[in-house]
Amino acid sequence: MARKFFVGGNFKMNGSLESMKTIIEGLNTTKLNVGDVETVIFPQNMYLITTRQQVKKDIGVGAQNVFDKKNGAYTGENSAQSLIDAGITYTLTGHSERRTIFKESDEFVADKTKFALEQGLTVVACIGETLAEREANETINVVVRQLNAIADKVQNWSKIVIAYEPVWAIGTGKTATPEQAQEVHAEIRKWATNKLGASVAEGLRVIYGGSVNGGNCKEFLKFHDIDGFLVGGASLKPEFHNIVNVHSL
């Protein structure tokens, strides 16, 4: 089964009305290989609706966070139904900044992932280890623990993309080598085969996130288990276009 390449741009808490206009104009006017590469941007909440209205339709728009309840007294949270109502069809869950800064547990991330899927969103579920965990040779144990938490609550994996993002390589300028990324991605695929079945594992997209930029993205293409990228800072710049078009660089 051919897995469609996936490139996501996580804008984090960056951007202004003016800069978003520039970013959207660039996406709309640049020839991007969106037919072969599923391309999704994740702006701040403030700009979700205007982005969806203004960016071309073959580019997806997603939220950076979602809650695990339909509605109610949950000040500051995103409702999956409200996102869908606004034309937003993707969300991130479990980003390392949510796990570390906001203390989101594996179980909470799994609950949010489950609920978002049930409401009809496509979920990019983020997993990854800290530098201390990598140095203690705990990388695989950590990502398997995080994956098991999701698998305990989710049966249908057809609308999940797994983003492996080593925490030590996010916003630091450090990047896992393509070989390091492939090693973990292969272990994720092996886990999926054993836990979810061979056909689910073969169709599951596992993308890499961690200081990906226009200069290093092509190096990852030679590895079969790397199905795309979750891009941070570079997604705010024109080089994001090169990452989307990585196959023709």
Curated annotation (Swiss-Prot):
User: Pathway it belongs to?
Assistant: Carbohydrate biosynthesis; gluconeogenesis; Carbohydrate degradation; glycolysis; D-glyceraldehyde 3-phosphate from glycerone phosphate: step 1/1
**From which residue to which does any coiled coil extend?**
none
Where does the signal peptide begin and end? Answer: none
Q: Which PROSITE patterns does this one have?
A: TIM_1 (PS00171), TIM_2 (PS51440)
Q: Which UniProt keywords apply?
A: Gluconeogenesis, Glycolysis, Isomerase, Phosphoprotein
Modified positions (Phosphoserine) are 105, 199
Cell inner membrane as a keyword of this entry, yes or no, is no
At the top of the EC hierarchy, this enzyme's class is: isomerase
Instruction: Report a single Gene Ontology molecular function.
Output: triose-phosphate isomerase activity
Q: What is its EC number?
A: 5.3.1.1
**What positions does UniProt annotate as the active site of this protein?**
95, 165
Keyword 4Fe-4S present in the record's keywords: the answer is: no
Q: Please name the SUPFAM superfamilies in this protein's record.
A: Triosephosphate isomerase (TIM) (SSF51351)
Question: GO biological process: any one?
Answer: glycolytic process
Residues reported in the UniProt entry to bind substrate: 10, 12
Q: Which family does it belong to?
A: Belongs to the triosephosphate isomerase family.
What protein name does the entry list? Triosephosphate isomerase
Originating species: Schizosaccharomyces pombe (strain 972 / ATCC 24843)
